[in-house]
């Protein structure tokens, strides 16, 4: 199938209805394809294991080999499939997961790997997954930001990739730090609603006059930012995890990742289209086994709690959960007891809507040095994410009259993973 030209079943009407906030956004034509109406809104939760989790200590253990490390492999709820003993709770719900053991990104670099992971591209300037999904799943009654990224306070660098590219400011990720509400959501008591409404009318009229004869995109960017802030002020309670029960705080874990996932659940329940939660400190160039015991203990418990809650609330069937870092870690153990960057053979997982649960796709060789079968590229995963969410990944953006594929046309969805 020609991924660029395959458009059967879609009417030509405005897919991009929102104002854009960058110069390039002015070139997005309304002549693009609308997504089909869905009975329930699809949502995306990206659990990002920042730094690159070791596949040997998580999804693809190699016990008893020179690359395997000290940990055992344990049985799971999928007969014949084993994962690391560092994920004992996850082993009990493997029948809910879709695991890919054959990712070959060949990008052993944090920043480049993170961008390629999120955009499915190696060329800069394309929207990352959260921004693309926020746009492509946008509904007329959405008023909250479509993409919210949650992280702890700390190093930024590659962890803050959230570029909407040519989609504009409306689809940039809103960043939440330490599960706290964005600053200044509470209006001063002296500001009365009737005054705010009057100021809004004056502002919009002034904007319209100012835009005459000028490039309107920078002005639109300010307006979009203002409207998003106004929407957040009206729904500031969705960020307040103190409203969650003490037992929920305990179940999710008192660490940053646990509390941030608790907030993510609230945001998804409130209708946010895409939420990303970053779990830090997987970049174990030294003392890899010590650090993975700590990180896996946090991740294991919180992941299972979150998936169970989403399932019990009937949300998992409409939410795609993606669990991945930007790379894997070397089979070789260095002289500091660490594992270094590795992009040639690593693992990730998914759960929820649109993917087949209880399967393991692809494999690596005995030492985990190379992909043995069913190699997967990051572009393939990007197509697969979109398809799982009910989005035709062969659609095009239309920019200045030229088509620009939503997903890399050199890649394709992994049909065997799709439900």
Where are these regions (language model features)?
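Ligand-binding pockets and gating/stacking loops
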Residues: 1-419
């Amino acid at each position: 199938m020609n991924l660029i030209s395959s458009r059967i079943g879609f009417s030509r009407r405005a897919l991009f209805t929102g104002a854009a906030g960058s110069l390039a956004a002015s070139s997005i034509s309304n002549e693009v394809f609308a997504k089909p109406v869905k009975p329930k809104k699809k949502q995306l939760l990206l659990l990002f294991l920042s730094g690159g989790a070791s596949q040997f200590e998580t999804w693809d253990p190699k016990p008893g080999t020179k690359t395997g490390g000290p940990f055992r492999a344990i049985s799971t709820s999928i007969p014949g499939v084993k994962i690391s003993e560092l994920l004992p709770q996850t082993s009990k719900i493997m029948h809910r997961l879709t695991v890919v053991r054959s990712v070959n990104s060949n990008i052993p670099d944090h920043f480049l790997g993170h961008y390629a992971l999120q955009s499915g591209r190696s060329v800069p300037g394309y929207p990352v997954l959260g921004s693309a999904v926020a746009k492509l799943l946008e509904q007329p009654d959405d008023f909250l930001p479509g993409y919210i990224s949650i992280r702890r306070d700390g190093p930024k660098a590659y962890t803050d990739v959230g570029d909407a590219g040519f989609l504009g400011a409306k689809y940039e990720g809103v960043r939440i730090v330490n599960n706290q509400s964005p600053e200044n959501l509470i209006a001063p008591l002296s500001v009365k609603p009737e005054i705010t409404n009057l100021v809004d009318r004056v502002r919009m009229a002034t904007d319209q006059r100012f835009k005459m004869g000028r490039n309107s995109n920078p002005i639109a960017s300010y307006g979009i930012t203002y409207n998003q802030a106004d929407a957040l002020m009206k729904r500031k309670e969705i960020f307040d995890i103190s409203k969650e029960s003490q037992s929920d705080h305990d179940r999710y874990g008192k660490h940053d990742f646990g509390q941030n996932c608790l907030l993510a659940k609230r945001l998804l329940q409130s209708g946010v289209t895409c939420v990303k939660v970053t779990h830090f400190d997987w970049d174990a160039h030294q003392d890899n086994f010590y650090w993975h015991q700590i990180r896996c203990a946090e991740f294991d418990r919180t992941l299972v709690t979150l998936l169970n809650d989403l399932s019990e609330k009937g949300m998992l069937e409409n939410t795609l959960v993606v669990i991945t870092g930007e790379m894997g870690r070397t089979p070789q153990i260095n002289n500091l007891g660490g594992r270094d960057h590795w992009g040639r053979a690593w693992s990730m997982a998914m759960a929820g809507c649109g993917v087949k649960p209880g399967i393991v796709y692809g494999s690596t060789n005995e030492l985990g040095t190379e992909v043995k079968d069913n190699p997967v590229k990051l572009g393939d995963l990007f197509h697969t994410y979109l398809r799982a969410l009910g989005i035709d990944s062969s659609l095009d953006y239309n920019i200045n009259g030229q088509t620009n594929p939503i997903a890399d046309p050199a890649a394709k969805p992994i049909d065997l993973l799709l439900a």
